[in-house]
Amino acid sequence: MLDNQLLRENPQYVATQLLKRGFQFDAVTFSQLEEKRKALQVSTQSLQNERNLRSKAIGEAKSRGENIEPMREEVNKLGAKLEQQKTELDEVLKQIEVISLSLPNIPHESVPVGKDELDNQEIRKWGDVPAFSFPVKSHDELGEALGQMDFALAAKITGSRFVVMKGHLARLHRALIQFMLDIHIQQHGYQEIYVPYIVNADSLLGTGQLPKFEADLFKLTGDNGYYLTSTSEIPVTNTVREMILSAEQLPIRYVCHSPCFRSEAGSYGKDTKGMIRQHQFEKVELVWITKPEDSYNALEQLTQHAEVILQRLNLPYRVVALCTGDIGAGSAKTYDLEVWLPSQNTYREISSCSNMEAFQARRMKARFRNPDTNEIQLVHTLNGSGLAVGRTLVAIMENYQDEHGNIHIPDALKPYLGGIDIISVK
């Protein structure tokens, strides 16, 4: 959510900034609603004051034994008019809130202006793209040939965009989770946190998934209004909702492993084969809560921490700055890490690292006390994948395959697999 004061005082500036995203904000209509709100608030307060004065006068007249019925009728008329004004004011406030909740974040000035992913800017590359002397296979071809990855069985159990993994591939998948957690906790200093995988609507509103992106979520039946979490960013970030933190508590740096559940409502026809885009997947998430002045340095650190995982696994990747037309609605600035997939002969997203600035904090009422001014200020929130586990498995399978369809284990993972150094075709 954007700053209400900014929206009220300079809606045209907001419209200009959001246009960089391709988002049309009707500043004129918003300003008209704001003028109506102010007029109704002044009118309502005036009627309230007048009714209070008349009510007091009734009490004084009654003590003098005067006839108060005409005065009481006037007060009743004022009361009815006041209730009508309050109803109108509530309706205008609801309209303003609907607009406010629909607005995306203002992009940071350093974000490249562009229309879509074609306008994203490559920042750096790491690692050498492997040169194979044989026709490479995709991860799903490799997994099925190994007899350890079964999409047909998953489709029978549930439906499309699911997978069943067995044997060493299932073990490798689990090892990746532990490896990522160990690096982030032991070397990067994150605190591990375990959170619910089911969240309520208030949490989703706080991090920005509701009301705009409900179609991307799996909603549970029943009267609780619960949803399966699409990313642990949601429950982890909401741990500071409606809190006033001390400056000494900041920055807060959490790492969390969780399954994620997404409907992929807007992804019909995309990545229909394999594990690239699934309804259920595992992710290790990094979340920062910082002071406003520290958040952009934090974004660079968070991104580098995610990069370390790829470097330890010796997987070629690149870092891309998303343009204004491609960043997520709540983000002010985002870096994507894209790993090399030989079967597609291209880089694919494996992590998205974002600074949300105060966008989520304003929705969540997540604040801290500034020791220099003693003022209560909004924190900044950041999040990023460190990494998406399934896509990391995919990248290992494809980059570490040999001509026989065997998968060689990266050195960094061998201690997690009891010394296994190859997953062989039988």
UniProtKB/Swiss-Prot annotation:
Compartment(s) of residence: Cytoplasm
Any one Gene Ontology cellular component term annotated for this protein: cytoplasm
Record-level Gene Ontology MF annotations: ATP binding; serine-tRNA ligase activity
Pathway(s) of this molecule: Aminoacyl-tRNA biosynthesis; selenocysteinyl-tRNA(Sec) biosynthesis; L-seryl-tRNA(Sec) from L-serine and tRNA(Sec): step 1/1
This protein's record includes keyword Coiled coil: no
PROSITE patterns registered for this protein in UniProt: AA_TRNA_LIGASE_II
CDD domains named in the record: SerRS_core
Amino acids binding L-serine: 231-233, 285, 385
Catalyzed chemical reaction(s): tRNA(Ser) + L-serine + ATP = L-seryl-tRNA(Ser) + AMP + diphosphate + H(+); tRNA(Sec) + L-serine + ATP = L-seryl-tRNA(Sec) + AMP + diphosphate + H(+)
GO biological process, one term: selenocysteine biosynthetic process
Binding site for ATP: 262-264, 349-352
EC number: 6.1.1.11
This protein's UniProt keywords: Aminoacyl-tRNA synthetase, ATP-binding, Cytoplasm, Ligase, Nucleotide-binding, Protein biosynthesis
Highest taxon listed in the record's lineage: Bacteria
Subunit text: Homodimer. The tRNA molecule binds across the dimer.
Family as reported in the entry's similarity comment: Belongs to the class-II aminoacyl-tRNA synthetase family. Type-1 seryl-tRNA synthetase subfamily.
Entry function: Catalyzes the attachment of serine to tRNA(Ser). Is also able to aminoacylate tRNA(Sec) with serine, to form the misacylated tRNA L-seryl-tRNA(Sec), which will be further converted into selenocysteinyl-tRNA(Sec).
UniProt comment concerning the protein's domains: Consists of two distinct domains, a catalytic core and a N-terminal extension that is involved in tRNA binding.
HAMAP family registered for this protein in UniProt: Ser_tRNA_synth_type1
NCBIfam families documented for this protein: serS
Official protein name in the record: Serine--tRNA ligase
Source organism: Legionella pneumophila (strain Corby)
Taxonomic placement: Bacteria, Pseudomonadati, Pseudomonadota, Gammaproteobacteria, Legionellales
